[in-house]
Amino acid sequence: MAVGVPRVVQARAACKHPSASNASLPFDPSIDGIGLDESTGELYYINPLSAPLFAERANINQSQLVRLDPEADPVRVAALVNFVSSSWMALKCRAIGGCQGRTVVIVGATSASGRAAAIVARSLGAARIIGLSRNEDTLAAVEGLDDRVLLREPFTLPESVGPLHIMLDYVGGPAAVGLLQSAQVEPGENLQYIQVGGLASDAAHMLQLLPTHLINLKPICIMGSGMGSFTKQDLRREMPGLMSFITKIKVPFEIYPAPMADVQAVWGSENATKKRLVLVPSL
């Protein structure tokens, strides 16, 4: 019914993602999608990497399916799931103790995933949400933030930000180092740094730049969040709640549905770059 084409799918198609490093042709780079059971008419979310989904039909193990509400829009769910799940899974499965009552910083808050993260963190009970980005105008338009900080070299946080508990980083690169060095940490608590994305893919990784003494000077926990970070049990537990959440929230970006038959034409198009591409069955 619908398959999203987020950045990770594009990276897999180009063999620039770890999950596709050993791929051989023919290769289907899809991650997940929405399917229709032709025998019952029921809609299902298909769990990540359960089957190749750039196809008219797919044979899926029932354990990899999450039933959706009959009124769910397949295109909407397919467009949102990757962007929303990145912060949902990070805050529910990676952040120790979750984000309830805590301060969450989103580095790269103007990205599609960053915008979704603000909505997710609020729904999961974060007490304060701070967004960081280089662009003042687009940062001002991000909904759900309590405070906004412009990313400027040397990438330091103002003292007015106060103590932080969780830092979700969608950018990576040198900015994270300056932010961790200048971040305040509440006594008795850890600052949990979770790298979720790598928008600064051309820059050196923060672990290459991080002064080793910093993790001795501050109680900092450094971790990643991605497909290899979660167990099958994590996914089965979280997906029903995530799907229910996705069907109710406001979409924070434009969606571009296109027929599967036009995949070559739309893959690198301007619409696919500015909007969130979702492939649907050809008529």
Locate predicted features.
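Glycine-rich phosphate-binding loop and adjacent beta-alpha segment
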Residues: 174-248, 282-283
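NAD(P)H dinucleotide-binding glycine-rich loop of Rossmann-like/cofactor-binding domains
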Residues: 29-34, 43-109
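N-terminal Rossmann-fold cofactor-binding loop
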Residues: 132-136, 170, 226
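C-terminal hydrophobic helical "lid"/dimerization subdomain
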Residues: 231-283
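Mid-domain Rossmann-like dinucleotide-binding core that forms the NAD(H)/NADP(H) cofactor-binding site
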Residues: 78-157
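Short, glycine/polar-rich helix-capping loops at beta-to-alpha or helix-loop-helix junctions
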Residues: 53-54, 133-144, 205-212
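N-terminal Rossmann-like NAD(P) cofactor-binding module of classical short-chain dehydrogenase/reductase
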Residues: 165-168, 194
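Glycine-rich beta-strand-centered segment in the early N-terminal region that forms part
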Residues: 1-9, 14-52
